[in-house]
Amino acid sequence: MKLAILSRNSSLYSTRRLVEAARARGHTVRILDPLRCYMRIAADGFSMHYKGRPMTGVDMVIPRIGASITRYGTAVLRQFELMGARTPNPSDAILRSRDKLRAHQLLAAKGIDMPVTVFGDNPDDTVDLLSMLGPPPHVVKLNEGTQGRGVILTEKASASRGIVEALRGLYANFLMQEFIGEAKGADLRCFVVGDQVVASMQRQAPEGDFRSNLHAGGTAVAAKASRAEQQVAVRSAKALGLSVCGVDLIRSARGPLVLEVNSTPGLEGIEAACGVDVATRIIEHVEKLKKP
C-alpha cells in the first residue's frame, strides 16, 4: 500500500511512530507537508502536486493536521479523497471535530451526554444565557482552542459576565459549560481505533489548575475504561465520522460525560502511559479500509 502521512514535522513522535509501524508492515510511506501540497480543480479531474512533482497513486492518507492549518490541511485531504485515496478520518469529519460547538450539537443529537453547554452572541442576552447554564463555577472555552489553551474557570457569576464581555470585545468565538466538580481535575482519554478503544489513560491536572491536558502540565497514567465509557467513546467517534481519535471523558455522578473528540490525538503520551503499540493498531486499521 502506498501511504501518505500529512504532517508539517517529520520529527514529531506521532509521525515517526506511524512511519515505523507502516514500514514494518511492508508499506511504502511518504510524509507530506500539507502546506507544500497544491492542487488543480477542474471538471475534467483533480490533481495534486508536491514540491514541483505530481502526486499520484496514493492509496491511503493519514492526516496529522494541526489546528493552525485546519482549513488548508483539510482542503488538501479532501483533494486526495476526490482523487480516490482512502483515509481513516475524512476531511469533513475533522472539520466537525475542530468546531467545538458543532461537535457538541452532533453528539447531543445522538444522545451522548456531556456537560451542559450554552452559546450566545448578543451582550443583552448574557444574564439569561448564564441562567440557562446554572450557578457557577463555569468553564469558558474558545470554540477552536486546543491543548487546554483558551479554557477559563470562573467561580462567580460576575466573573463569568466579565469574561464573556471581554471575549466578545475581542470578537472571539466561545462557548460556556457547567463545571463538574466531582471530576477533581481528572479526565479519561480513550483512544479509539475503528470500533474499539485500544488504550486509555487518566490525565490529572497539576496542583492549582483544572485542565488535565498534558500540554498544560497534566500527568497521565494507564487507566481501565469501563464498558460504558468505551461505548460512549466509540459512539462519539462514529457520531463525528472519525475512525481514529482521542475521546476525552470525565467521570461524573451522572456517568461519563464527553468533553472533546480530538481528530489528531498524540501518540507519545498514550503509548508511554499504557505500553500499547497504538501506531501499529492504526496501521492495521487502515489496511482494512483500503479498497481490495
Swiss-Prot record:
Keywords: ATP-binding, Ligase, Magnesium, Manganese, Metal-binding, Nucleotide-binding, Protein biosynthesis. Its cofactor is Mg(2+); Mn(2+). One of its GO terms (biological process) is SOS response. Its EC number is 6.3.2.-. SUPFAM superfamilies: Glutathione synthetase ATP-binding domain-like. Pfam families: RimK (PF08443), Rimk_N (PF18030). Disulfide bonds: none annotated. Gene3D superfamilies: 3.40.50.20, ATP-grasp fold, A domain (3.30.1490.20), ATP-grasp fold, B domain (3.30.470.20). Mg(2+) 1 binds at D248, E260. Mg(2+) 2 binds at E260, N262. It comes from the Bacteria. Mn(2+) 1 binds at D248, E260. One of its GO terms (cellular component) is cytoplasm. One of its GO terms (molecular function) is ATP binding. Mn(2+) 2 binds at E260, N262. InterPro entries: ATP-grasp, ATP-grasp_RimK-type, ATP_grasp_subdomain_1, RimK, Rimk_N, Rp_bS6_RimK/Lys_biosynth_LsyX. It is an enzyme of class 6 (ligase). Binds 2 magnesium or manganese ions per subunit. Residues 104-287 form the ATP-grasp domain. ATP binds at K141, E178, F179, D187, R211, S212, N213. Belongs to the RimK family. PANTHER family: RIBOSOMAL PROTEIN BS6--L-GLUTAMATE LIGASE, RIBOSOMAL PROTEIN S6 MODIFICATION PROTEIN. This is Probable alpha-L-glutamate ligase. The gene is rimK.
